[in-house]
């Protein structure tokens, strides 16, 4: 008897691999290439970014399709600002909801649905709010707007238990962030740096390099 692949826990994947790929646009060729590359390299979580009108339908439809075609991949939705959108994502089968802000109602919605939540924060106060609201890992956003390594060193010196995830980082930025104590990284367009987003092999090469630099391992 063949056992169906079990969808992993996205935050567990992030803790092991130290990577959470996030992609846009959501055309099928791009989504499938990323999904195939993620599975090949053991990065078994993928975030689909909401970007303007029509993106919710595209993201939620992609989740449904990937659940059927790539059941071993935990797929989630990013750029979620409110509980209504979070509920729609959960109903569509998302396994993680990622936000640029910390909205406790969104966290409660995810908890009720048994879905992982990765909220965003930009200050120590916002990080504390996210943690008090149930987050075990917190996205640093917008990480590109500050000296992220310096921020991490300062924050973790006072709150070493925080698990902070800078996002939209390039391969060259990862070593300094690792040294500063980042718990993981959101990667996507800047990781590709001009490589074909429809090529699973090109994406896989960058994921392999990022895993090596980040100190993560296949899940």
Predicted features along the sequence, with ranges:
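Conserved N-terminal beta1-alpha1 strand-loop-helix module at the mouth
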Residues: 1-92, 112, 171-172, 196-219
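Catalytic beta/alpha-barrel core
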Residues: 22-24, 44-55, 72-81, 94-103, ...
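Catalytic cores of alpha/beta
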Residues: 34, 82-92, 125-134, 169-185
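Glycine-enriched alpha-helix->loop->beta-strand junction motifs that scaffold or abut catalytic
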Residues: 39-44, 70-72, 90-97, 111-118, ...
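Glycine-rich beta-strand-to-loop/alpha-helix junction loops that act as flexible
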Residues: 77-78, 164-169, 185-189
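Glycine-rich phosphate-binding active-site loops on the catalytic face of alpha/beta enzymes
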Residues: 96-106, 139-148, 181-203
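Short, charged, surface-exposed secondary-structure boundary motifs
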Residues: 106-110, 127-132, 148-151, 175-176, ...
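Shared catalytic-loop signature of beta/alpha-barrel
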Residues: 129, 145-165, 169-171
